[in-house]
């Protein structure tokens, strides 16, 4: 590997392997094991739609002898070859795990029945269900004589069908049917004996009814297998000349349907002649990812598996933060002291309540907020619209380039503007990823401000499963600097200078990288002076070479470095094997570890930050991101305690090293520590 760094895409696949480990873990509830299979599948879909698509574009440019205006650590062709090897190996492991889970389901009297195993009453049910519910959505496509295939949807599941008469095997027809799972759902509960839950998949209902669908052909043999294609989903804004930014996004979303196939996944028992025909018509080449699999595909739907399993250990419900247990008005609390919410342990109510209260408070003048990914039927947007209706000045910076949320955000933009909300969108070549809010109100004839700075999205639904931190504050120094960010977001089109340098906040792309380097250098200096020195960083991903090199210098100087990285870590070979080895772990459990936290020992007077930014080039150089120092002593201790709990995890923590083995941290007969459970106990005991 060039520069001895692990390529980011190979590191990401190693992260997805950790998700697969959860599906394989017998200590995880069966319901969650199935959910993790769905997460693994959904993750891989997005990986191919974005990362593999990008690598394939690079290969095309190289083939055309065009230069790449991008720094990569390895040849795209070599990375694609390695991806194919890893994905095929993971697909085999996935199939093995699913077979084991299926056996466990049968033990629990949950049976997934295919079209060949229906009893008489189930056959009648499936026939009637097809006529009543499914048939209006079925559009058979006869394809054997077409010069090219009709449009096939990205992410949709298809049945590829060979029809023939047993008496004349040479007279065949090929057909395709799109499985309408988006319209009517993938899973159907069948009538079954008492105490048993029988489930059939929608594609098997369609298979059972193929003789009816194609009755006019008089065929008596049908061979049907599923496949799906994944398409390039990148939006190329530079190609849309003459359009404004919103029009470019809108057209880019529509153009996704024209994306080239980057992956073809199929049932390995598919008719060989039909398989070759599809590969030829889809213009798939040796560079394409053609992946054989089992009978079931699009496992992402299994994240919504029917609720037929009763589990002993259900996920604990979020609880109120102690500051809000007495239903006190949120603004009253924040104006007196800082509060930090830790999701999903704490409930999300204070964030929604803060906005709802502001919407109805006669003394509130304005609300400024950033939005990246929002919940459907968003309570946040509802509160902001209510505020605008009540005469408040509401400004929302809505990031239209949030990948796969572009269409939803365009709809939110239209809705909010119709209600009088000022919606700002689009800075060229920059995404606004910071999670910040400021509310201004009058208190006793004085203007005061309060708001929040968060690591997670304004999304009350994902807040139930994403582990994030949100600082509610009225600190004047912090909010004055947050205001500078909003001023820039509002006025950049007027040619305003970039955000001024700040004393407290670390802001990308202005100061964050240099500030982090300075903080690392301080620890190096302390180590050389003989002081205990330590850096602890928790991130989703760490792939920035400059900061990795800086950490390498810190290790050589004797600084203890702890990394808690959920996803990508492009570790330099040997960093974990040096005299002062790096301690790098990844925690994958029932909650998705989404928070970014930085702790610098600072001779015992720790400097602690929460941040919206990962340590990646895109976050540090091409996004507006905000990291905030934790100034409140109690909150600082609380956050350090939570991170220390995670560093002690010996149940769900994996060791991150350049071998990518994902070995679990050994418990070595010590007390078993499952950090998400321990964090729940720690926080629920707080007063």
Q: For the regions a protein language model found, what residue spans apply to each?
A:
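Polyanion-binding catalytic cores of nucleic-acid enzymes and NTP/SAM-utilizing transferases
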Residues: 547, 551-553
């Amino acid at each position: 590997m060039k520069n001895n760094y692990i390529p980011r895409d190979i590191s990401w696949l190693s992260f997805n392997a950790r998700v697969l480990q959860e599906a394989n873990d017998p200590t995880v509830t069966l319901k969650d094991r199935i959910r993790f299979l769905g997460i693994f599948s959904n993750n891989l879909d997005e990986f191919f739609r974005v990362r593999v698509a990008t690598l394939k574009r690079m290969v095309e440019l190289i083939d055309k002898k065009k230069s790449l205006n991008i720094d990569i650590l390895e040849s795209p062709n070599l990375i694609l070859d390695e991806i194919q090897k890893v994905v095929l190996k993971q697909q085999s492991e996935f199939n093995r795990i699913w077979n084991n889970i299926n056996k466990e389901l049968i033990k629990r009297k949950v049976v997934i029945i295919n079209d060949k195993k229906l009893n008489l009453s189930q056959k009648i049910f499936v026939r009637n269900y097809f006529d009543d519910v499914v048939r209006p959505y079925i559009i058979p496509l006869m394809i054997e004589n077409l010069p090219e295939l009709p449009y096939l949807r990205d992410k949709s599941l298809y049945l590829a069908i060979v029809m023939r008469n047993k008496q004349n095997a040479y007279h065949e027809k090929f057909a395709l049917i799109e499985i309408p799972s988006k319209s009517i759902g993938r899973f159907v509960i069948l009538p079954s004996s008492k105490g048993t839950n029988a489930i059939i998949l929608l594609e098997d209902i369609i298979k059972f009814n193929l003789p009816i669908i194609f009755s006019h052909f008089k065929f008596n043999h049908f061979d049907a297998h599923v496949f799906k294609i994944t398409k390039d989903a990148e939006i190329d804004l530079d190609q849309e000349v003459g359009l404004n930014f919103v029009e470019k996004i809108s057209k880019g979303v529509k153009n996704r349907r024209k994306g080239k196939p980057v992956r073809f996944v199929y049932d390995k028992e598919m008719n060989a002649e039909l398989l070759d025909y599809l590969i030829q018509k889809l213009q798939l080449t040796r560079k394409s990812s053609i992946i054989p699999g089992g009978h079931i595909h699009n496992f992402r739907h299994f994240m919504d598996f029917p609720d037929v399993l009763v589990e002993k250990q259900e996920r604990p419900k979020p609880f109120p933060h102690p500051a809000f247990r007495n239903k006190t008005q949120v603004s009253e609390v924040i104006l007196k002291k800082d509060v930090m919410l830790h999701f999903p342990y704490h409930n999300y109510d204070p964030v929604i309540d803060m906005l709802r209260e502001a919407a109805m408070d006669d003394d509130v003048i304005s609300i400024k907020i950033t939005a990246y990914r929002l919940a459907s039927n968003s309570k946040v947007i509802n509160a902001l619209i209510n505020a605008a209706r009540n005469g408040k000045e509401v400004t929302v910076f809505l990031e239209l380039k949030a990948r796969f949320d572009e269409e939803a955000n365009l709809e939110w933009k239209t809705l909010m503007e119709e209600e009088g909300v000022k919606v700002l969108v689009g800075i060229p070549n920059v995404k606004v990823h910071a999670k910040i809010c400021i509310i201004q109100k009058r208190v006793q004839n004085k203007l005061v401000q309060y708001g929040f700075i968060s690591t997670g999205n304004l999304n009350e639904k994902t807040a139930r499963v994403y582990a994030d931190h949100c600082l509610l504050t009225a600190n004047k120094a912090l909010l004055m600097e947050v205001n500078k960010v909003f001023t820039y977001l509002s006025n950049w089109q007027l040619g305003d200078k970039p955000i001024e340098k700040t004393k407290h906040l670390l802001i990308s792309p202005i100061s964050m990288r240099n500030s982090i380097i300075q903080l690392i250098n301080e620890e190096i200096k302390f180590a050389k002076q003989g002081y205990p020195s330590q850096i602890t960083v928790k991130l989703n991903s760490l792939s920035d070479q400059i900061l990795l090199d800086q950490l390498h210098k810190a290790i050589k100087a004797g600084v203890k470095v702890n990394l808690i990285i959920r996803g990508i870590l492009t570790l330099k070979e040997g960093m974990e094997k040096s005299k002062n080895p790096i301690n790098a772990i990844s925690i994958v459990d029932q909650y998705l570890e989404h928070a970014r936290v930085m702790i610098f020992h600072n001779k015992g007077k720790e400097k602690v930050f929460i941040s919206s930014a990962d340590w990646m080039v895109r976050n540090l150089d091409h996004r507006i991101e905000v990291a905030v120092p934790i100034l409140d002593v109690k909150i600082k201790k609380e956050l350090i305690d939570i991170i220390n709990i995670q560093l002690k995890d010996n149940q769900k923590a994996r060791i991150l090293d350049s071998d990518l083995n994902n070995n679990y941290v050994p418990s070595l007969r010590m007390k078993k520590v499952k950090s998400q459970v321990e964090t729940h106990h720690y926080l629920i005991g707080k007063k």
